[in-house]
Amino acid sequence: LVSTHNEAGLTSSLSRIIGKSGEPMIRKGVDMAMRLMGEQFVTGETIAEALANASKFEAKGFRYSYDMLGEAALTEHDAQKYLASYEQAIHSIGKASHGRGIYEGPGISIKLSALHPRYSRAQYERVMDELYPRLLSLTLLAKQYDIGLNIDAEEADRLELSLDLLERLCFEPQLTGWNGIGFVIQAYQKRCPYVIDYVIDLARRSRHRLMIRLVKGAYWDSEIKRAQVEGLEGYPVYTRKVYTDVSYIACARKLLSVPEVIYPQFATHNAHTLSAIYHIAGQNYYPGQYEFQCLHGMGEPLYEQVVGKVSEGKLNRPCRVYAPVGTHETLLAYLVRRLLENGANTSFVNRIADQSISIQELVADPVASIEQMATLEGGFGLPHPRIPLPRDLYGAERANSSGIDMANEHRLASLSCALLATAHNNWKAAPMLGCASSTETPAPVLNPSDLRDVVGYVQEATVEDVDNAIQCALNAAPIWQATPPAERAAILERAADLMEGEIQPLMGLLAREAGKTFANAIAEVREAVDFLRYYAVQARNDFTNDAHRPLGPVVCISPWNFPLAIFSGQVAAALAAGNPVLAKPAEQTPLVAAHAVRLMLEAGIPEGVLQLLPGRGETVGARLVGDDRVKGVMFTGSTEVARLLQRNIAGRLDAQGR
C-alpha cells in the first residue's frame, strides 16, 4: 500500500557509489540520494512544475494542497522571501483552480514561522503587529481565487499563539461568509480534544465553516527533547504511539459531529485509522462532508483504493495530497521529519513493510491494544516505561532541574506576579564572614539596562575582612573535613531545592542586575541547581574521608556573565570535596552571589565554611590569591587575568604542586 516507485533504484544506486568509496564518491552518493528522495517526496521544484505533475493524480480524482518548502524564517529577508513565494503560489494555484472552489479545487498550506523571524510567545505584540497583516493579505488573496488556505501546525509552544492569530482572522470583516480558512491540529498533543472544542466554538462565534486538518503530528522527537532540555513538568505529547492513534479516532469523531461548522480533513496513512473514520462517518456521504489527506510520495497507493467509484471497487471518498514544492536544497528539514516519522518502529508505514508483522497485528484496534497493556501494567494511560518524565531524566541519583514554560499563560501570570512582588526587594550584598566584618558605606548597584533603577546596595570587603575570612576558613576547615560526604551531599541538595524554589525572584534579580533575558535567567538558575545536585552526587559516590584529603581554604572567583551558575558551580565543587570556600563574585553582580550564599547557608553549610567577599579584583581578589594560607584557586574569567593569577600562585607551589 505504501511502496515507493524508486526504492530499488535508490538502494542499488547508493550501493554502487558507496562501494567505490572515497570522499568525493560518498559526497556524490549523498547528493544523488537527496535528488532521488526529492523526486519521491517533492511534487516539483517550482509551483508551475508541481501543478503540471499533479495533473496525473487529479485525473484520478485526487485533490491537492501545495506547500512551499522552507523552514522558520531567521531574518526579515527570509520572511519577505517566503511571503513572496506564497503570494506567487496562490496566484498560480488560483488560476489553475478554474473556479472549482475550496472543496473541489486545489489549496495551499502555509507555515506561520516562515512569515516572521520572531514567531514566539515572547514576541507576542510584534507577531500580532507584523505577522498578522501578512497572514491576512495571503488569506484575502486566497479568498480572491476561492482556494482553501490551511495554517500548518508547528511546535507545541506556538499553539496558543497560532490560535490567537486564527481567532483574529476569523473575525476579520473582509472574510465574512468565506469558508476557506483552514487550521491544522495534531492528535499527538494532549491538548488536542480541547483545541477542537475551541475551534468548534470559534467557528460558531465567527459564523465560518472552518477546514480542520487532523494530523498525528510530525515533531514528536523534538517535543520530547524540548521538554527534557527545558525541564518542563511533563510532555505536551503522548509518549506512546497507540495513545495518539486512539486520540486521533476520538478527535475525528468530534469533528464529524459538527458538519455545519467544521469541514474535517483527515490526514493519515494508517489503514486502520482510515477504515475507522470511514465507518464513523457513515454510508450517507455527500460532497463537502469530509475528505482524507495524504503526503505526496507516500500515501497515493493506499488512497488509490479509496478515491474512485464504488462500481470500480473503490470507497468513493475524496483525498487531498499534501504536495511539497521546492528545490532539493530546501528539502532537508522536511525530509528529516518524514524519515523520523516513518522510520519509527511504531509507524504504520514502517510496520507494513516488515514482513514479520502479521496483518492482524498491523490493523489491531488501538483501543484493544491499550486495554491489553492496561491488564499487563495494572492501569490505563501509563506513560512509556523508557521515557521518564523530564524531572526524572537522570534516574534515581539526582533530579533534573525544573524550568518554566514561557509559552504557558498560567506560568507567565504566576511569574508576572512574582516579579512584581520582588521588584522592590531591598537587595543587599556585604561581606558574609564566619566572624565579625567591617561596616563600610554601601554603594548602589544599578540596572545595566536602566541606570535609573537601583537594584540594591553593596558593601565591598576590606583588606581586614579578607584576612579575617581566611583565618575563619582555617578554623572551620577541620569541621567541614570531618563532615561525612553523604552529609555534605545532603546539604548541597537542600541548597539546590531552595534555589529551585526561588527561581522566580532569582530571575528578576538576574534580569535587573546582570541584564539577562528571562529565558537566559531561567537557564542560569537551572544550571546552578544542576551544579549543586551534580556535585552532591560526586561527593556521595566518589569521596570518603579516609581516602580523600581536602586542600584547605579555596578561593572561588567567578565572572559577571554567569553570576549564579558559574559562581554556584565553583562553590559546590569545592564544598563537595570538603574545602572551606572564600567566594569573590564579579564586582558587577554581587547581589546575585549574596542571595546564592544566603540560600546555601540556610541549607546548612556551617559558618566559616562558606564566606562571601564582594569587591574589586585588584584589591579583594589579589589579597585572597596572594595569601599563603589559601590552598586552591578556582577562576573563570579572561585569559589576561588568568595569567596574572598563574604567575602569582606559581611562586608559592610546593614540590607536589600544592
Residue ranges of predicted features:
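Catalytic cores of nucleotide-enabled group-transfer and carboxylate-activating enzymes in metabolic
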Residues: 37-48, 58-64, 74, 137, ...
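Terminal low-complexity tails and localization/encapsulation signals of metabolic enzymes
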Residues: 313-315, 326, 330-333, 337-471, ...
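Generic hydrophobic/aromatic pocket-lining and core-packing "Φ" positions
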Residues: 139, 252, 571-572, 621
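Conserved NAD(P)+-binding/catalytic subdomain of aldehyde/semialdehyde dehydrogenases
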Residues: 542-544, 548-557, 602-658
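Conserved small-residue-rich beta-alpha loop and adjacent elements
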Residues: 541-607
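Conserved helix-loop functional segments at active or binding sites
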Residues: 92-95, 140-141, 168-171, 254-257, ...
